[in-house]
């Protein structure tokens, strides 16, 4: 009965969060680092999440705490991130793990950050003939204007159910989560997923 009440409470919290219109989590990435910023009022406006309740991946703690936000700033290859290379860009997959203090269940928020690939045509169009550097001129590498392109982020909520031992999506809690679309992504707990 307690598990049923707790799962209903999480469903209510996730429903309120999705309908609030607030951007609760944002993710920025480039080819070397990524940053995730989560609102401390992630699920309910009056209930702030503590830094010990939210982890990046399975075990990476918060790197910066502000009154209204928790920030994670890590190397692109840490915290269990999975990198996919596509023809039009690079996709960085990671997740936030929310483990509340007083409840024995936890939730995972999957995140994706897309780094679009810049084509050679786009690079050629940025440099005009009067910007070319002659042989006698030197280039100050510190002043090169190279910024990572704008990123996109996607948020997929899922819940781990202690009763059945599977992950579920919030739009239909009865359908279990069957893992990432790319089966080469190996998690720390592969036995928890349906195969």
Swiss-Prot record:
Subcellular location: Secreted
One cellular component (GO) term of this entry: extracellular region
Signal peptide residue numbers: 1-21
Tissue/organ expression: Oocyte-specific.
InterPro entries assigned: PLAC1_fam
Record key words, sorted: Glycoprotein, Secreted, Signal
PANTHER family given in the database record: OOCYTE-SECRETED PROTEIN 3, PLACENTA-SPECIFIC PROTEIN 1
Protein name: Oocyte-secreted protein 3
Species in which this protein is naturally found: Mus musculus (Mouse)
């Amino acid at each position: 009965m307690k598990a049923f009440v707790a799962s209903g409470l999480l469903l209510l919290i996730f429903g309120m969060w999705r309908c609030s219109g607030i951007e609760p989590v944002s993710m920025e990435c480039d080819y070397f680092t990524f940053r995730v910023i989560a609102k401390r009022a992630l699920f309910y406006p009056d209930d702030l999440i503590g830094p010990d309740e939210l982890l990046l991946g399975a075990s990476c703690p918060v790197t910066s705490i502000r009154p209204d936000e928790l920030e994670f700033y890590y190397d692109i290859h840490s915290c269990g991130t999975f990198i996919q290379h596509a023809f039009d860009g690079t996709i960085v997959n990671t997740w936030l793990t929310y483990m509340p203090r007083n409840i024995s269940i936890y939730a995972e928020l999957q995140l994706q950050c897309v780094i679009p690939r810049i084509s050679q045509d786009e690079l050629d169009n940025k440099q005009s003939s009067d910007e070319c550097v002659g042989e006698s001129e030197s280039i100050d590498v510190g002043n090169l204007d190279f910024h990572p392109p704008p990123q996109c982020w996607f948020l997929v909520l899922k819940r781990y159910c202690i009763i059945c031992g599977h992950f579920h999506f919030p739009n239909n809690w009865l359908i279990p989560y069957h893992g990432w679309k790319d089966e080469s992504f190996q998690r720390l707990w592969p036995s928890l997923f349906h195969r």
